[in-house]
UniProtKB/Swiss-Prot annotation:
Locations listed in the record: Mitochondrion
PANTHER family the UniProt entry points to: 60 KDA HEAT SHOCK PROTEIN, MITOCHONDRIAL
Family: Belongs to the chaperonin (HSP60) family.
A biological-process GO annotation: protein refolding
GO cellular component terms attached to this protein's record: mitochondrion
InterPro entries: Cpn60/GroEL (IPR001844), Cpn60/GroEL/TCP-1 (IPR002423), GroEL-like_apical_dom_sf (IPR027409), GROEL-like_equatorial_sf (IPR027413), TCP-1-like_intermed_sf (IPR027410)
Main location (coarse class): mitochondrion
GO MF assignments: ATP binding; ATP-dependent protein folding chaperone
Protein name as it appears in the record: Chaperonin CPN60, mitochondrial
Function: Implicated in mitochondrial protein import and macromolecular assembly. May facilitate the correct folding of imported proteins. May also prevent misfolding and promote the refolding and proper assembly of unfolded polypeptides generated under stress conditions in the mitochondrial matrix.
One Pfam family in the UniProt entry: Cpn60_TCP1
Keywords: ATP-binding, Chaperone, Mitochondrion, Nucleotide-binding, Stress response, Transit peptide
Length: 569
């Protein structure tokens, strides 16, 4: 079948392409970016406003999370939607890398694109202006590094988390306590609670540095994770290519009506396709994960997981053969398994605690016998995974809407706190970017730059003042007055406390941002804005008119069941 036929059968059809060039293309894209930014920017700061989002099913969603607002927006005009999609992608990228800063990146991208568009219409070279923007970003990043301060104490961790949770002290304290319990590099997850209160629980858990083989296994579209409970775990020291290799296992879990996690060297070809089809059709709750590590280290880690979950590693070299003889006792078990793109977390494995302790003692003994720094690193890594608990923040609330909104804030706060631990903190409330604008004043006067490049520098200088202005505006203040006062005093740690409506030392007041979040927001925003400024043509699909309602399709009899296992395969 040709490509058009395939698309049509998937419910998508178009009647050709629509193209806009130059100013016409940029005007339309800018309109979409402006509208998206306006909706997102109202959430910025401690007094940011709520946004209500209609849901396809159930009650409307109420949120102050910038990336959630951005994801919900889609315009009828396809060219406006192009611009919105590009900025929405920036927000997603910023969120994935730094865990926060999505609203800041959206505001910055909108300003850089808007000011850049005006400059281009007045005759500025978009290419030279883009070079100026890139130079300005480098200078701002250097300034942010100089302003940053290493985060050390539990109090500082709590402050960062509180700010990212829109001033919720309870969430900040929970995250600070969680990091104290499992360490700054420890595993912390967020889940739905069963009470009105938000609680912290530290459970026995193990994390692996590998995620799902295919995104089709995802069960939670929002978090892009596979979340399953009471799961059997099959550990395979080989590649699984055909479904026949694991058919007895699938028959067993289908009868038991339990989910299955397969951790193997790889799962591909027919086996992967069959698992995905049956998962999508609701016949199996399953997820395939590639085994972590390489060589002997991979083998050892599989055995570590086996001991933690109470299972065995399937290895044909030891005479095992699932097709001829399957013993369900080789399967491990865990109360909960959470699988992301790059990480798998196994909670409450069914392994014998005594066996786990013996395994840890064995690894410690091996540590004392090796002189290889590489082997020591891998042994320490295995020991940490077996020893480390997992902190679970259980979010409670009076309704699903309240729990959902609170989970957004907890996740944002957790991600921002991790970013703060990795690269330090800077004055919050937009102050760090505001003070970086002083360094750009010097760059804008650099005689080696062309006038068009200087225009690019001035655009960034204007844009990085806007987050501070927006935060003050959302709190009911005069943004221009506040930033003028701060720049005039030139006290690099001074800022405006929008919650209290007064000027304070931001570090002392605990109003701080992770340096990584601010840097990532700026880099991503400047990148996409620069691309839109230099865009000379935009192409979209012209949707085909909806077909008239008619009768059912003749000649399509019922689809026959697939043989074996009651139509599963």
């Amino acid at each position: 079948m040709n490509r058009a036929g395939v698309l049509a059968r998937r419910g998508y059809s178009s009647k050709g392409k629509d193209i806009l060039f130059g100013v016409d293309a940029r005007v339309k894209m800018l309109a979409g970016v402006n509208r998206l930014s306006q909706a997102v920017s109202v959430t910025l700061g401690p007094k940011g406003r709520n946004v209500v989002i209609e849901q396809p099913f159930g009650a409307p969603k109420i949120t102050k999370d910038g990336v959630t607002v951005a994801k919900a927006i889609e315009f009828k005009d396809s060219f406006e939607n192009l611009g919105a999609q590009l900025v929405r992608q920036v927000a997603n990228t910023t969120n994935e890398i730094a865990g926060d800063g999505t609203t800041t990146s959206t505001v910055l991208a909108n300003t850089i694109f808007s000011e850049g568009y005006k400059a281009v219409t007045q005759g500025t070279s978009p290419v030279d202006m883009k070079r100026g923007i890139d130079r300005a970003v480098e200078v701002v990043l250097q300034s942010l590094t100089e302003q940053s301060k290493t985060i050390v104490s539990k109090e500082e961790v709590t402050q960062v988390a509180t700010i990212s949770a829109n001033g919720d002290v309870e969430i900040g304290q929970l995250i600070g306590h969680a990091m104290e319990k499992v360490g700054k590099a420890g595993v912390i997850t967020v889940s739905d609670g069963k009470t009105l209160d938000t609680e912290l629980e530290v459970v026995e858990g193990m994390s692996l540095d590998r995620g799902y083989i295919s995104p089709y296994f995802v069960t939670n579209a929002k978090t892009q994770k596979v979340e399953i409970e009471d799961a059997f775990i099959l550990l395979c020291q080989k590649k699984v290519s055909t479904i026949q290799q694991i058919l007895p296992v699938l028959e067993h879990i289908a009868k038991a009506n339990r989910p299955l996690v397969i951790i193997a060297d790889d799962v591909d070809s027919e086996a992967l396709a069959t698992l995905i089809i049956n998962k999508i059709n609701g016949k199996l709750k399953v997820c395939a994960v590639k085994a972590p590590g390489f060589g002997d280290n991979k083998t050892n880690m599989l055995h570590d997981v086996a001991i933690f979950t109470g299972g065995e590693v399937y290895n044909e070299e030891l005479g095992m053969n699932l097709e001829q003889h399957f013993d369900h006792r080789i399967l491990g078990f865990a109360k909960k398994v959470s699988v992301g793109k790059d990480q798998t977390i196994i909670l409450n494995g069914a392994g014998d605690p005594k066996a786990v302790e013996e395994r840890k003692e064995l690894i410690q003994g091996m540590l004392g016998k090796t002189d290889s720094s590489y082997e020591k690193e891998k042994l320490n890594e295995r020991l940490a995974k077996l020893s480390g608990g997992v902190a679970v923040i259980k979010v409670g609330g009076a309704s699903d809407v309240e729990v959902g909104e609170k989970k957004d804030r907890v996740t944002d706060a957790l991600n921002a706190t991790r970013a703060a631990v990795s690269e330090g903190i800077v004055p919050g409330g937009g102050a760090a970017l505001l003070y970086a604008s002083s360094a750009l004043a010097e760059l804008a006067a650099d005689p080696t730059l062309t006038e068009d490049q200087k225009t690019g520098v001035r655009i960034v200088m204007s844009a990085i003042k806007l987050p501070a202005i927006t935060i003050v505006k959302n709190a009911g203040g005069e943004g221009a007055v506040v930033i003028h006062q701060l720049l005039a005093e030139k006290k690099m740690q001074q800022g405006y406390d929008a919650q209290q409506g007064k000027y304070v030392n931001m570090f002392e007041a605990g109003i701080i941002d992770p340096a990584k979040v601010v840097k990532t927001a700026l880099v991503d925003a400047a990148s996409v804005a620069g691309l839109m400024i230099t865009t000379e043509a935009a192409i979209t699909d012209i949707p085909a008119p909806a077909p008239a309602a008619g009768g059912g399709m003749d000649g399509m009899g019922g689809m026959g069941g697939m043989g074996g296992m009651g139509g599963m395969y």
